[in-house]
Swiss-Prot record:
Coiled-coil blocks: 311-388
Domain of life of the source: Eukaryota
Parts of the chain on the Mitochondrial intermembrane side: 138-621
Name the UniProt record assigns to this protein: MICOS complex subunit MIC60
Keyword Thylakoid: no
Membrane listed as a keyword: yes
Biological source species: Phaeosphaeria nodorum (strain SN15 / ATCC MYA-4574 / FGSC 10173)
All ranges on the Mitochondrial matrix side of the membrane: 32-116
Assembly: Component of the mitochondrial contact site and cristae organizing system (MICOS) complex.
Length: 621
């Protein structure tokens, strides 16, 4: 139906087509899926013409345009009635009707989406058809429709081709040269499409004046029919009387030996095609020879100019590229050298700054240490001087008093109390001897305290258990006559000072490993078997681990409290907590408790020795 309506409307738009045909020749449209404005479609593209194949270029006789048919034939073809197909089948004359079944279910209502899609499809098809029709009428809308609407260019090209075939009924339309699939693209710099120019011009006056019905030709229908009949009679008479044959001067084809450019080759091919067409026309009488000779000479000159320009441009471009390459290499070398110098200078600057900063920090710390040492020495010296000064003042006063008393006594007794003086001297000697014993006792106490601190320091600073037999022997030698110190040393387990005791950090690390094993056996009874061990191991994985000073006597609470006490440094309380375990938990922690016991024994002995030394110093005072 759409094609029929377009065919009926085509006679009305033919005057517009004649007016807009020059515009179509200027605007080079290409019929393809992707439209490129810089390319032009050419039917049956000719191969590239080379100088060797220029002389062989010919046009087959089937491609030479033939004269159009007589006006009567064209008019008859245009005035042929169009048979419209039946759109609806005839209905029968019967009037019988059948009542609907009362039990028939109600038809289901169709969805809105289906109806929407149906009407949307119909409206889209109608809009697309209207766009195609209006594109055949308006040039501006034609450009818009073919460029922005999908497949619009193909649809418009199809109807334009049908209309053109209807106006120009050539027998050569079946040639594969003008098939749409043989259209190729050519750049906009090439010459306007010669093949399309041929079939645009070929419709003659007879076709243009064929029986079209328009508003500007209705009044002169009879006159045009008479003129068409007279023209047909004249054509028949001319065809009946053949003209005498005249000798035909064939033109030579154009041969350009240096035509390496594709555009020049296309121009050569076009000129050769024109020469072939002229040679096929027997009535040219050599009137195109001068124009073609001039065109050949001009084309040769243009080709030589193009080759010369190409050579000059190639030479200039090579020189520019070479100079640019040299400049780039020179700039790159300078840049590399400059970067090397900058990096070396930066590295030297950083080294110098690093050395200066290191020296400054070292000097600063040395000055600070020196100032602190000097301040401490000054304080100590001043304190010592003050004490010595006080003692000297006290001794001077006491000596002055004693001298005064003795002088007075001598004055009073006139050397009568020499016995008292001698007794005083004996008492002074005795007091001096007693003070010597006190000083010796203080030195012994200090040595004992230093030895105890040495043992404690050796035990606290060790990373792994080490024997401390040497320190203990020195302590025993210093306190050889003290029974309390000897008893305290004898109470230490020999394995403790021969193998060493672990530090608090090692005890905590050992406790964490023991705690993991104790948790696995937390749920075991005393007479547990293999199954009980496996069950306890499985249940220990799902038990919640307590933390902090947990309340309770269960294994998890005891382990949590022990860990907190160990972190606080209370080893005695931690050992007491672990000693309160029962069953397999106590058995597994037995070795750890033994180590804790040895550590506590050593600590207790050292505390007793330190207390004894402190007590001796107090008794001496």
């Amino acid at each position: 139906m759409l094609r029929a309506s377009i065919l009926r409307a085509s006679p009305a738009v033919r005057p517009l087509a004649r007016q807009t045909r020059p515009q179509w020749r200027v605007v080079q449209r290409c019929y393809a899926d992707n439209k490129n404005l810089g390319e032009t479609a050419v039917p049956n593209p000719a191969p590239t013409v080379t100088p060797s194949s220029t002389e062989k270029a010919t046009i087959p006789s089937s491609d030479i345009p033939k004269p159009p048919p007589a006006p009567e034939t064209a008019g008859a073809s245009r005035s042929a009635p169009t048979i419209q197909p039946a759109t609806t089948p005839p209905t029968g004359p019967g009037s019988a009707s059948i009542a609907p079944d009362p039990k028939q279910p109600k038809p289901k209502k169709k969805g809105r989406i289906r109806r929407l899609l149906f009407w949307l499809t119909i409206l889209s098809g109608l809009g697309y058809a209207g766009g195609v029709w209006y594109s055949l009428v308006s040039d501006n809308f034609h450009d818009f429709f073919t460029e922005y609407v999908p497949y619009g260019e193909d649809a418009v090209a199809y109807f334009e081709e049908r209309e053109f075939r209807k106006r120009v009924p050539w027998p050569c339309w079946d040639s594969p040269r003008l098939q749409p699939q043989n259209l190729v693209r050519r750049t906009s710099s090439s010459i306007l499409r010669p093949q399309w120019a041929e079939w645009r011009v070929l419709p003659t006056r007879a076709t243009a004046t064929s029986g079209t019905k328009g508003p500007h030709t209705i009044a002169n229908v009879q006159e045009k029919k008479q003129e068409a009949a007279q023209t047909a009679t004249v054509v028949k008479e001319e065809a009946a009387a053949p003209a005498p044959a005249k000798p035909v001067n064939h033109l030579d084809h154009l041969a350009v030996p240096d035509a390496n450019d594709a555009v020049v080759q296309d121009v050569v091919k076009i000129v050769n095609d024109i020469i072939t067409v002229i040679n096929a026309d027997s009535a040219h009488d050599g009137k195109y020879n001068s124009a073609l000779d001039k065109a050949k000479s001009e084309l040769g000159r243009v080709v030589s100019d193009i080759n010369l320009m190409k050579a000059n441009l190639r030479k200039e471009s090579e020189e520019k590229v070479k100079s640019a390459h040299d400049e780039f290499e020179q700039a790159a070398k300078e840049l590399v050298q400059r970067l090397d110098h900058q990096m070396q200078a930066q590295e030297a600057h950083w080294k110098e700054e690093f050395e200066n900063e290191r020296e400054r920090l070292s000097q600063t710390y040395k000055d600070r240490l020196r100032s602190e040492l000097e301040a401490a020495e000054k304080v100590y010296e001043q304190k010592t001087k003050n004490e010595l000064l006080q003692q000297s003042i006290h001794l001077q006063k006491s000596f002055t008093a004693s001298v005064r008393e003795r002088v007075e006594a001598e004055r009073d007794g006139r050397l009568g109390k020499l016995n008292e003086l001698s007794s005083s001297v004996h008492e002074l000697e005795k007091l001096t001897a007693e003070w010597n014993s006190v000083v010796d006792a203080n030195l012994k106490t200090q040595h004992l305290v230093v030895a105890v601190e040495a043992v404690k320091s050796a035990l606290e600073t060790q990373a792994t258990p080490k024997p401390f037999v040497t320190e203990l022997a020195a302590l025993k030698e210093i306190a050889a006559d003290d029974p309390v110190v000897s008893a305290a040393i004898a109470s230490i387990n020999p394995a403790a000072y021969q193998r060493g005791i672990p530090s608090p950090a090692l005890l905590i690390d050992r406790f964490r490993r023991v705690a993991a094993e104790v948790r696995k056996a937390a749920l075991l009874p005393e007479d547990a078997g293999v199954a009980s061990h496996i069950a306890s191991l499985a249940m220990s994985k799902v038990l919640f681990k307590k933390s902090g000073l947990a309340v309770g006597q269960d294994v998890e609470a005891v382990l949590a409290r022990t860990e907190v006490l160990l972190e606080e440094g209370d080893l005695d309380a931690a050992a007491r907590e672990m000693n309160g375990l029962q069953g397999w938990a106590k058995v597994l922690s037995k070795d750890w408790l033994g180590e804790c016991r040895r550590v506590l024994e050593v600590r207790q002995a050292l505390d007793v020795i330190a207390t004894e030394a402190r007590l001796n110093s107090l008794l001496v005072d």
